[in-house]
């Protein structure tokens, strides 16, 4: 597999999580609860953290939300969850961070949108006020530019300058440039006010895939700040998953991006953790990181008129997901395990041999038996109506025998 060479950046510490080129690409998420409702926000943070989110962002939009942040962080710590909590500020962050110092101290990072803090205007020092609090508390900051809330004064100025050119650029290109200028100018001002380069993360979010790729390629060439990747609004369902994957994977393959968020729109009362799982799957599918054993299963065709292989694949995948909270604390490297559940003789044996453990179920008109391969070799052949239970037992034994010794060595047993 080709090596991905990460773009060189400083490393930013966010709580106990490191983000930058010398650290793994970090998965983050954001709550959609009212932060002032501390109990509901704690509940959602627990779900996101247990799903694997390594950073969690919460909205801090009013006094009650700011008052709730310390209780949120303390409540999570009491149950053993120390995932860094990031405060998302718009319009009034300079007021809230000054007014509620306990909130400023409890948060692990502040997100500032330069498009709505009037940065650069002579009569407005809101941005400086927020940076001053970050410097005082030694907190990192993400300067997050969004095309939907871009500094209109800056954009208008650049549009006017463009209109005077002999060959004006397209409006889309001017907007992309304005986003980059906003991010870089804001970062330079933040450094003048006392933030170090290893305390600054930049993002320039749009909602179109090609726009995302273009703006981050250009931004990456023009600075060495840590970069946060993501579409500002990916959308719902398959559209959101595909758009995020298409955009992020191109940039990640080029070594661009140090932390990612997949901004999926959940269904009403839907599961917020889906965005975490999709982000993890993007990284794992690209062999950038490993989070959980991967189950390979064929899509099925006319040779597989039975649904049994589909049912087995689903049951094994669900079983692995259920076991992972225990497995990852006991077994070193289990997240890299590959399991194959195949439906006929065409690709079944070959795919199973390439996996750590695989089973090739019989297709239509094939002999009713299922060979099981372990580390490329035929181990046994299963028959009858206990295939699920027997294969699960083999899987458990493989995990225990293959990965337990590493865990014992790691703890010095």
Curated annotation (Swiss-Prot):
It comes from the Bacteria. One of its GO terms (molecular function) is 4-hydroxy-3-methylbut-2-enyl-diphosphate synthase activity (flavodoxin). Its cofactor is [4Fe-4S] cluster. Keywords: 4Fe-4S, Iron, Iron-sulfur, Isoprene biosynthesis, Metal-binding, Oxidoreductase. Binds 1 [4Fe-4S] cluster. The keyword Nucleotidyltransferase does not apply. It is an enzyme of class 1 (oxidoreductase). The keyword Membrane does not apply. It catalyses: (2E)-4-hydroxy-3-methylbut-2-enyl diphosphate + oxidized [flavodoxin] + H2O + 2 H(+) = 2-C-methyl-D-erythritol 2,4-cyclic diphosphate + reduced [flavodoxin]. Pathway: Isoprenoid biosynthesis; isopentenyl diphosphate biosynthesis via DXP pathway; isopentenyl diphosphate from 1-deoxy-D-xylulose 5-phosphate: step 5/6. InterPro entries: Dihydropteroate_synth-like_sf, IspG_bac, IspG_bac-typ, NO2/SO3_Rdtase_4Fe4S_sf. GO terms for biological process: isopentenyl diphosphate biosynthetic process, methylerythritol 4-phosphate pathway; terpenoid biosynthetic process. Its EC number is 1.17.7.3. It holds the Pfam family GcpE. [4Fe-4S] cluster binds at residues 298, 301, 344, 351. Belongs to the IspG family. HAMAP family: IspG. Converts 2C-methyl-D-erythritol 2,4-cyclodiphosphate (ME-2,4cPP) into 1-hydroxy-2-methyl-2-(E)-butenyl 4-diphosphate. This is 4-hydroxy-3-methylbut-2-en-1-yl diphosphate synthase (flavodoxin). The gene is ispG.
